[in-house]
Amino acid sequence: MNPLSKLLNQQIRYNGPMSISQFMEICLLHPKYGYYTNSSPFGQKGDFVTAPEVSQMFGELIGLFLAQAWSDQKNLEEAVLVELGPGRGTLTADIMRVTKSIKNFPKKIYLLEVSAKLKLLQKSNLEGYQVEWIKNLNQIPPGPIILIANEFFDSLPINQYLKGADGWHERLIGIKNGELAFGISEQKLNIQSTEYFTHAVKGDIVEVRPSVEPIITEISNKISQWGGISLIIDYGCWDLKGNTFQAIKSHKYINPLEKPGEVDLTAHVDFSSLARSVLNCSISKLTDQGVLLERLGISERANILSRSLKADDLENHIAAHRRLTHPNEMGTLFKVMAILPKLSRMPLGL
């Protein structure tokens, strides 16, 4: 039992079972034992690889996509670039590099990051740029935003609800035989009737992210008032159903209750939930990541880059292209959705 397991065990014995969202927040963000406090999760030597770390092509194409979408709005106000959960800063660095000669593209960057360790990596990778770190979106000054959220929403804590014979119960984390274990609340819950809960049958699990609505509402408020675009890329689907709570360690899935603080905890993103929180803006169709990248010309870009590569470098380059776009890899699992001002021209590719 590691130190955070002991702490959680003590807290549950004292306060009773905790929600999955409480468990996720403690495991990921505990100031001493949290995953993002102590780990270096990204890359082959970490626990997972995000699309920007797979190949520079991802950030280059996304950067040009955002620049074109912003240009189409013909907005003369000065915009800022915002990234939520920027990891090592690789995506923002690639975006800024590929757009450096585009006059009306933002020069000021705001990064929403809670990990002090990751902030240091971002500072190193974005040296020379105008970067400011924020704790919430309210710290962004008035004006248009070009916002990117790549694998951000999947890491936000979820709550789970189980449909029983007598109604809805919350799925909780307690202790069984001295170990962390899943259970359900004794009392049934008075759940508001929504599409999620109305059509469920006995045994169904519904996941809810409490923090999604305020974040998406704030983003859409800024875009509706000032202009800009938000591009959300994550793994998930429309009208998500079932239990998707998962833990990743060294690129493998393990029991989410094992090794708390040492594993990445996530759940799939329900894009319909994100869309319902959008106010006074347009949203794009949900598009597969692979489809978007192919429409943006990743195969052509891959061919150009391959001309100077040989042996292992060429093999790795081909594998990266496949990983980003192939239906059996990231191409279909990851989805893309954009938020834009009402009546805006839908960006090419979506």
Each PLM stretch: what is its role?
Residues 135, 142-165, 206-210, 214, ...:
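A short SAM/SAH-binding and catalytic strip from SAM-dependent methyltransferases
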Residues 58, 147, 234:
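Conserved RecA-like P-loop NTPase ATPase core
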Residues 146-197, 245-256:
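A mobile, often basic/glycine-rich helix-loop segment
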Residues 1-84, 88-136, 140-144, 161, ...:
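Rossmann-like AdoMet
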Residues 192-350:
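Long, Lys/Arg- and hydrophobic-enriched amphipathic alpha-helices
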Residues 116, 153, 237:
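Short, glycine/acidic-enriched loop or turn micro-motifs at the edges of active sites
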Residues 28-33, 188, 234-238:
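Short glycine-enriched loops at secondary-structure junctions
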